[in-house]
Amino acid sequence: MTDFEQRSIISGVGQSAIGRRLGRSGLDLTIDAALAAIADAGLAVADIDGLATYPGAGAAMPGFSGPGSPDVQDALRLRLNWHSGGLEGPAQLQAVVNAVLAVGAGLARHVLVYRTVTEATEQGRGGRQGIGLGGGGGGVPRMGGSMQWTIPFRAYSAANWLAMNAQRHFHEFGTTPEQLAMIAINARRNAALNPKAIYRDPMTLEDYFASRIVTTPFRLFDCDAPVDGSTAVIVSAAEHAPAVDHPVARVEAVGTALRGRPSWDQFDDMTTMGARDAAAALWTRTDLKPADVDVVELYDGFSFLSMCWLEALGFCGVGESGPFIEGGHRIALDGELPLNTHGGQLSAGRLHGFGFIHEAVLQLRGEAGDRQVASGPEVAAVANGGGPVAGALLLSRL
């Protein structure tokens, strides 16, 4: 099958420093990541004619939004034929999907795509306390959007909302806390091999259960770690592929569908949510099957989300992710389906979806160092998002 996706490759990847409260601006971190990705792709700054980001500065959430595309365009003095940024779409991957669409349409040859967060610094300042609150004219702020149905009930966080989904999964399918723990323990085991990871100390099952409950059934280690950092990728037209001395990742397919009710707490299937629709759409756009995938980098803003994606993408049956990951053997680096090989957001840090893309490309190129999957992966699946917000990406080594 040949679709618009397969006209695109990921020719380069780059990251800034990643850490807790680095004290650097989002733009500063973005430029570091961008220049690294451009160099990795064998390009010059002048070759970049497209720019995409998520969510863009317009989201106006301190630490979360990152610099907008006009800021980066100005800082790098780019001459753009196309640019994009926005919050509403198939999760964080929408920036990559938009870039692939632009390349497929001939609007750009080389698109710089980036995601930048300074959440660790801003949370230390109390900078995200107002997220979801409307108003702004003084007095008592008013809730807006979907949060008007959650904040009055003191459900301030996605942890609260997604815990309900996890509880439903536990109830419907007999999923256990011991099974859920394997996502966090596997992530930490892989992070120990990643020099950029935030948390690298070993974690046992006893350590996991000793951590405090955040919102049942999620414990502290089920929740990802806020960080400061930026990740950039270069989406290039395959016909204009730069000459590089490493393999590149071809974009095989994207999954962007949303067919259920766009609600965190009123979705028609509370156990899979938007992952169900995005994953189903992904497999209609490729001749590849789940059995062809060698490594998976699945969103783990909360550990349960990786389980949702395993089911939605067809790596196990609906309701069977608990037994599938039990003991952690199948999802280990040397298992049948290595999962979140860099440590995921649980241990490597919340780079808000883009860390998974970066890691998938490194694995396909055989450049992941001590955490490299020994079998030499040829196909990787990447998934972002939770609740009604979801996007999936299939990459192959070219």
How does the language model describe each region?
Residues M1-A91, N98, A102, N165, ...:
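Conserved active-site "lid/cap" helical segment
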Residues M1-L27, A36, M182, I213-D277, ...:
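Condensing-enzyme catalytic core mediating Claisen C-C bond formation in acyl metabolism
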Residues T2-I9, G58-T150, R154-W161, Y199-C223, ...:
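Conserved catalytic cysteine-centered active-site region
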Residues Q15-A17, P55-A59, E88-Q92, R115-T121, ...:
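Acidic, glycine-rich active-site loops and adjacent beta-strand->loop/helix elements
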Residues V45-P55, W82-L87, V111-T116, Q179-I185, ...:
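Beta-strand segments within the central parallel beta-sheet cores of soluble alpha/beta enzyme folds
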Residues A59-P67, W264-F267, D300-P323, G335, ...:
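Short glycine/threonine-rich loop-to-helix capping motif typified by GTGT followed
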Residues L87-V117, A159-L193, V233-E239, A348-A368:
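Active-site-proximal alpha-helical scaffold in enzymes
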Residues D269-R276, A280-S303, M307, A312-F315, ...:
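Extended C-terminal subregions enriched in glycine
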